[in-house]
C-alpha cells in the first residue's frame, strides 16, 4: 500500500526507495522461471517513453522488449486538447495501417513468438505483457473507430448542484483538469469513441496472445491474469481520465484462468485488491511469497466462486481513503475523516451519484463502515517487514 512503501506518485525507480524488495517476477526468477517484460509494466510517461524501458526495474527480468510502433512516429497527427501534450490530457488518432504496425500490435507479436519459443524449449516462464492502450493518446487503426458511430454515443450528464453534495477534496479531484470541465457534447463523443476504439484494439491484441497460448498447447498448464492499473472516467461525474476515489477510477478488471480450476466462467462477487495478485500467483504455482506481502491469496475463488478471501477492497488517493464492500462504497477525506465523507449504496446507485453520508438514516451504516475503514488504514500503514526503505521527497520528479 502507498502508506507502507511511502511511494505516492508515479515516475519513480523502485530501487531508489526499496532497494531490497523482491518483486513478483523476481520470485519466479529465483524459482527457475524465465521472466520477460514486454511493454509497459512499471511506470512510463506515455507516449514519451514508448520504445524505452521507462521507469523499469532491470532486476525483475531475464529479458525485456520495448516495442515502438507507428503510433509513436505519427505523434504529429494526434489531436490533443492541450497541443504538444498527449498523455495527461484527452488526445486521439484514428490511425492508418494495421494492428501489427502499432506498438501494442508489435508487443502481441513478440509475446506470441516468445510463447512458441517457450513451448519448443519446454522452459517455465513468467511473461508480463503491458499494453499501452487505452492510455492516452487513444491511438488505434481506423477500423476500430468505425465500430462506434459517434451519433450513437451517449455523453454522461451531471445534475445541477451535484458538486455541492461532495466533500471539498472530492470536488477538487473532479475539477483538477480545468481544460476538461464542461466539454462540448460533440468533443465528448469524439473522446468516448476514441477510448472505445483503443479498448477494442487492445482487446484484439490480448486475443492474439491467447490464440498463441492455445496454438502452442501452453494454455493447459499456464496461469493467465488479465487486469489493468486503474479504472477510468469518460465524463461520469463530469470528469475525464483517472485519479479519483469513485468506482470509475478505483475499480479495475480482473480475470484469472488457471489449470484445474473448477469455477471457470463464473463471476466472484467478493472484493479483491491488486496487492492480492502476488500471493495468489505464488500459491497457484506452489511457490513461497515473501512474508512482507499485505495481500491475500485469491486462489480458493478459482474453485469456489462463493469464497470470500476478503470482505472489502481498499483504495487510497491523495488525502482520501475508500473501501468497497459488496453493497457500499465508503470514503473519508483527511485525518479521521475531518474533511468529509461519502457513502454510496450500489443496490440503488451503481453510478455513485447520491452521497448518503450525511443523511441521518444512514448514521449506523456510516459508523460501521468508518470503523472498518480506520482498521484498514491502520493496517495499510504498517511498514513492511524486512524491507529496507530509503526516504526521499515524493515531489521530486524522476525523468
Q: Where do the language-model regions lie?
A:
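Short beta-strand segments
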Residues: 39, 126-133, 223-228, 255-256, ...
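A long, amphipathic alpha-helix that forms part
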Residues: 105-119, 180-222, 376
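Histidine-centered active-site microenvironments of extracellular/periplasmic hydrolases
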Residues: 137-143, 212-266, 273, 310
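Short glycine/proline-rich turn/loop motifs
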Residues: 86-98, 172-193, 258-261, 348-353
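A short beta-strand-to-alpha-helix junction
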Residues: 12-22, 100-101, 164-165, 192-201, ...
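Active-site regions of oxyanion-processing enzymes, predominantly non-cytosolic
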Residues: 45-69, 102-162, 214-223, 364, ...
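Active-site segment of extracytoplasmic enzymes that catalyze sulfate/phosphate-ester chemistry
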Residues: 1-22, 27-37, 47
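C-terminal cap/loop subdomain of S1 sulfatases and analogous C-terminal strand-loop tails that border
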Residues: 54-55, 60-71, 100, 118, ...
